[in-house]
Amino acid sequence: MSRKTHGETSTSTGGVGTRLLKGIREIVLILLLALVISAVIRAFVGQLFVIPSGSMEQTIEPGDRVAAIKPADFKRGDIVVFKDSGHWLGANPPKRSAAGQFGEFVGVLPNTSSNYLIKRVIGMPGDTVSCCGPKGRMSVNGKPLDENSYLYRTNGVPVEPSQMRFEVRVPRDRIFVMGDHRDASGDSRCHLSDPAPGAYRGASAFIPIDDVVGPAKFTVSPLSRMTHFSTPETFDGIADRSASAPDKADITLHLSLIHISEPTRQEA
């Protein structure tokens, strides 16, 4: 009798162990599949980014998580995320742990890398962008822009489109970008006279189209700020001049006082 009981116990224990191992294998396979799917989505569909600064206020607030869609076309007026190949940013912020960086890599966690920035596209290749006209407006290819719908407001009054006076012609395969909080955005304007090793002065002000991750289409969190970004109507009807875009930007700077308060570590 005791032998039979012992045999039954051994068989029962072996069955539990087999089921446990099978369950572990299934969980591992499910996790691996989820990571692969997430990585594919990140590589070919879209990516989340955490915004730490106020350079795009009040359209995008610090702490918002936005989704950049790729591959997707973008146009003037769209908000885009792009790589900081021009080294606009200063010292890098502290890195996440190895687990956190892996989570970013596979798309489980939003990207917090300092190697990305987010701005609004003002000029496309061949465009002439200038500030400011008789009414203090930015203009693109001679058309004044009504930016009141997205510029940062103080006590209900939009900030000045730009304290810096300039006129540029955007070179081939590059774009000119600005933040919505013009007084707190270290954008293309602020790099028009920067030295650029191996290139002409001011070249780093113009973002290579190849560096654009994609247009930011949604704020996905916090839930109270979930929204969809659309292209402002003021950019409608501007002539396409990409066919005549120069290889080198034309840059004219006018004497003016400019104070940009955006911190060195500005974007994600």
Indicate residue ranges for each PLM-predicted region.
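Soluble "head" domains of membrane/secretory-pathway proteins
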Residues: S2-K22, F44, V50, E61-L257, ...
